[in-house]
């Protein structure tokens, strides 16, 4: 992920090594332009920027009015400050907490490459003094320090978020990004591990049989997908927010990119296609979602 961000920031996206990666996101950027979301909920993991080893919430929701890019040791990335959506974020926090998900509420929060790079890949490169196309709501998930949440817990949180969005009084078109690694390990004896069979099976089940994925234990992610493969549970927050049956609009997968697998998938609720043909109703929330991974995390 940091290497992908550096390629964007330093104008290397057309170099042969990187071009195949960025070409794979062109259709996704087109989908985002056509979808025109009002808000994007971005599920990601923080890398000791907003939090530290002294305080790591399992789930932390950004309720601030804005989210500046974090200085990760070499200065903030040259991307715009992200606008938040405090009204929807606070509503989600209230709804989820009353549904017994104990979210940490963040009224001030910096976002690092774990969030800004996925936004670049979906929205395209935007200069520092520009504006992201829509407000965002960060949802940081602890997949850095043991114990991380289970896949089932992440999936159920997604369902709770769906319920919250549907009960919000304003009619909004909301997309949700699930980010994090496909198979990769950045250190130790298995550094450089890539398991394409595991990755592709995960993407297949994400579309067709997510209930199979929610039962996968932590040890299987680490054994089959590497130490950082546990990040894949974050995709299940996104999947839980969608209908049981979804349409797979687009999939992209390539290896390697900075010694890791990179892939993403776009999923839409089947009801969305007919819903957008009707006159918007206050209680109806148009829904679409998208999941992606850009692996190689810095610690």
Each predicted region: which residue ranges?
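Short catalytic/ligand-binding loop motif for oxyanion handling, primarily in non-cytosolic enzymes
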Residues: 48-52, 183-187
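Flexible, D/E/H-enriched segments
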Residues: 1-38, 53-156, 167, 189-299
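Nuclease catalytic cores that cleave nucleic-acid phosphodiester bonds
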Residues: 165-171
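Glycine-rich, aromatic-flanked loop segments that form ligand/cofactor-binding clefts
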Residues: 44-48, 112
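Beta-strand elements within well-structured catalytic alpha/beta cores of enzymes
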Residues: 38-45, 139, 172-180
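Phosphate-rich cofactor/ligand-interacting catalytic cores and adjacent structured alpha/beta frameworks
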Residues: 158-162
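Generic secondary-structure microfeatures
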Residues: 143, 178-180, 186
């Amino acid at each position: 992920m940091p290497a992908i961000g550096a390629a964007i920031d330093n104008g290397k996206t057309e170099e042969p090594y990187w071009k195949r990666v960025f070409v794979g996101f062109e259709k996704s950027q087109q989908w985002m332009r056509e979808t025109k979301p009002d808000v994007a909920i971005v599920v990601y993991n923080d890398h000791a920027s907003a939090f530290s080893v002294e305080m790591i919430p399992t789930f932390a929701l950004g309720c601030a009015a804005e989210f500046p890019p974090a200085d990760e040791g070499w200065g903030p990335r040259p991307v715009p400050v992200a606008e938040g959506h405090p009204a929807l974020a606070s509503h989600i926090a209230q709804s989820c907490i009353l549904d017994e998900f104990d979210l940490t509420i963040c009224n001030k929060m910096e976002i690092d490459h774990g969030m800004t790079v996925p936004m670049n890949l979906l929205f395209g490169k935007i200069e520092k003094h520009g504006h992201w196309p829509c407000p965002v709501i960060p949802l940081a998930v602890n997949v850095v320090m043991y114990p991380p949440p289970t896949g089932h817990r992440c999936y159920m949180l997604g369902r709770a978020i769906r319920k919250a969005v549907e009960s919000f009084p304003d009619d909004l078109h909301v997309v949700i990004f699930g980010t994090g690694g496909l198979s990769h390990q950045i250190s130790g004896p298995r550094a450089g591990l890539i398991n394409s069979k595991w990755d592709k099976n995960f993407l297949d089940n994400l579309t067709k049989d997510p209930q199979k994925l929610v039962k996968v234990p932590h040890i299987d992610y680490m054994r089959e997908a590497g130490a950082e493969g546990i990040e894949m549970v974050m995709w299940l927050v996104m999947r839980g927010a969608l209908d049981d049956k979804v349409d797979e609009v687009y999939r992209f997968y390539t290896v390697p990119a900075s010694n890791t697998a990179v892939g993403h998938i776009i999923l839409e609720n089947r009801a969305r296609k007919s819903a957008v043909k009707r006159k918007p109703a206050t209680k109806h929330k148009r829904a679409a979602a998208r999941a992606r991974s850009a692996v190689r995390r810095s610690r």
